């Protein structure tokens, strides 16, 4: 099936404040909010990077950390500075998806990809924290990986596969 992707920006809808304490809470909050404006199914996501040695931060504040520092590049430098003497470099990319089917049912799933934080920024591909995240069993960051290879293994792909299975597409 073909689906048309419509973003809140194209509908001139501002995103709601993310007041949830988890990725799923924020994803659910957004899907309920955006569903008020349209009469078709809506999928919303909330994603981020959780670093064990930093008490799972930036977590739900991943995008806000980049905004606070002025860019993802500066946020990555900030993270690498905090990680400088840390032995535990384990991290997890998380994507929570919520689907409102327009019949009053909201379905939520979460995709997780474990990896580790690189010692320096490597690569220019992808976006966000991709240049410092090395998936387990890989030797390069997402920022160094070809786009198609990254897309077929990342946390969003995992979440969409779970959603697809749950709603039986």
Feature roles, as predicted:
Residues 1-169:
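Anionic-ligand binding patches
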């Amino acid at each position: 099936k073909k689906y048309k992707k419509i973003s809140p920006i194209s509908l001139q809808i501002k995103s709601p404040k993310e007041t949830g304490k988890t990725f799923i809470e924020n994803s659910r909050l957004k899907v309920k909010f955006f569903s008020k404006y349209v009469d078709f199914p809506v999928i919303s996501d909330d994603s981020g990077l959780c670093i064990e040695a930093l008490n799972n931060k930036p977590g739900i504040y991943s995008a806000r950390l980049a905004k606070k520092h002025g860019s993802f590049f500066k946020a990555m430098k900030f993270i690498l500075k905090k990680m400088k003497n840390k032995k535990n470099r384990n991290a997890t990319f998380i994507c929570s998806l919520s689907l409102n089917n327009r019949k009053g049912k909201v379905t939520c799933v979460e995709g997780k990809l474990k990896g580790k934080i690189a010692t320096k920024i490597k690569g220019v591909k992808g976006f966000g924290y991709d240049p410092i995240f090395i998936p387990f069993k890989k030797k390069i960051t997402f920022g160094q990986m070809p786009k198609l290879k990254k897309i077929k293994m990342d946390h969003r792909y995992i979440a969409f596969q779970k959603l697809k299975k749950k709603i039986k597409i």
